[in-house]
Amino acid sequence: MTIQYRSRTEIESIRRAGQVVMDILEMLRAATRPGVTTGELDALAASELKRRGATSNFKGYTPAKRVPPFPGVICASVNNEVVHGIPGKRVLKEGDIIAIDFGAIVDGWHGDSAITVPVGQVAPEARRLLDVTRAALWQAIAAARAGNHVLDISRAAQEYVESRGFSMVERYGGHGIGREMHEDPFIPNRTDERMPNPLLRPGMVICIEPMVNIGKPGTRELSDHWTVVTADGSLSAHFEHTVAITTGDPLVLTDLAREATGAEGRAV
């Protein structure tokens, strides 16, 4: 494991990439409504990246042993899709929820964030899922302090989610970020004491991204080799921020229009 520690200047560069991500995610949120396709949202994001002189860190991405390269600039995961949904012809309907994961490269530095958006009016249980997942993110961010360890972040989010009767997704989680989209350390969403648990130190920049299911935590991958869905077909939500570890409070580099009321999370 090789963890990078960033200078203030480098963190500011990552923040600039995060600002582009944040601005475009706000546009995607506003454009999300019944009748819109996930492909149209992807095209909007691509156009806005080009207009800002930024590039996508999603499109063409190929992790080890995964074929084909990811075809979109956003991940568009609808309802029971957890992460890595491929944008295309799917038409959003009233009552859907869509997780939009999006990143950008600005001057060689990466930003990454995700939101889950209700499409029109959604069922109370779906609304509560979004609120719990968003609040879990802020619980996790509050634990992202120098002197704590990676699994303190995982534990804070998981305990919050499970206390609300939902499940934290297995296998997937957050990551370091900087010159590459995915760097060390891995930030598991579910606490596993067998996993590496490095100390959090000032200068680390990480992406924290709880993925929460209404049902059980299990998932499966579809035949497109990308889309991950809940094993039991239940709804899933996903929120993410890029966060710098400092000598004091965690510094959120993709603070999407104050997604929550504070680090404690929204009351649910």
Feature map (PLM): residue ranges:
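Active-site neighborhoods and metal-handling regions in enzymes and metal-associated proteins
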Residues: 1-268
